[in-house]
Amino acid sequence: MKPRSWLLKLTITSIVVLGIPFGGVMAFNYYIDPLWNFTHSNEYNDFQNGFNERIQKTNWINAREGELNFDSLMIGTSRTTYINPSNFKEDVLHYGLSELHVTEYRDYMEYAQKKNAKPFDKIYMELTIRSFDLWVKPAFNEAQTFFDDSEAPFQRITSLFSYDTYERAKFNYEISRDNYTDIYRAYDRNMEVFTDVKQEDIAARIEKLKDQLKARDEYNPKWAAYDEDYKQRLLNIRNAFPESEFIVFTDLAIADRLKLTIEHPQHTENYKRYIRNIVEVFGKVYSFHGYNEVTTNWDNFFDVYHFYPHIGDMVARDLQNGVDTEILTIVTEENMDAYFESLGI
């Protein structure tokens, strides 16, 4: 056999031998689509692990470029991910992101607005009890990093070669096959969340929070700090969306953690300022902070920060109805003092 002929056959054989496994991995990654780069659905990708919503939800938006025509936007931290968009009468684009920092809100909101076919009629915006805390810093890279990565040429294709994508695809295949939702966030292809994750030891976690507060007090009697730019940040957000109605709401906090926080001497005045700033900017705030049968029942929470989705259904109901309920107080300038009194502060 001539050397050139032998070399050509060896090359072709190598390509075939190596190409079949690579092709199989690419096909599998595409079929399961753990990065949400595509729009197809099947029985083996109907549950998706929410490992990083900044990547996944941004990809979900770009996979539907030119097709987005949502009425409203939901923005907030991981707590909002358990408020499913199907609970709303209008079509809601859910851009809830784990550990979303107040300095990141506007970037993600403007990105969603740019991709949507029309201005949002309503923006449901969560501001948590820690959103004003100066010492809480952003936990992720800047938003533009995720936008650039999602829009990078050939990103959808090159990601199919990734072993990391394959590992995530394999996990999603398994939980979809078994209808397994014992993870923190199992998404379907419409960004609906399901979870049966086991509850942590809440009693132990509350005691740990008490110890942490005590340690901070001993280390620095004036450790709590309010972000002096907080109100201006809110004003900038409001002014960036002049055509949208804002429904601003607090996190629904488990009663024990709420009490520890707002009754702490260093937090009480900061909490009042936080509520006051929101009302000054938006006219009202939908507060889910309170002591009631929902917030005092630990069975409604799987940790001291997050409720189960059936409680999120209640939050969605109240955000739309716009009247006080057992779990909601709509705070305005007129009833603010009475609201603080109801919380014992």
Positions of PLM-derived features:
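Well-ordered, non-membrane alpha-helical segments in soluble/globular domains
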Residues: 105-109, 224-234, 264-278
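Membrane-embedded segments
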Residues: 69-157
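Alpha-helical transmembrane signal-anchor/signal-peptide segments
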Residues: 30-49
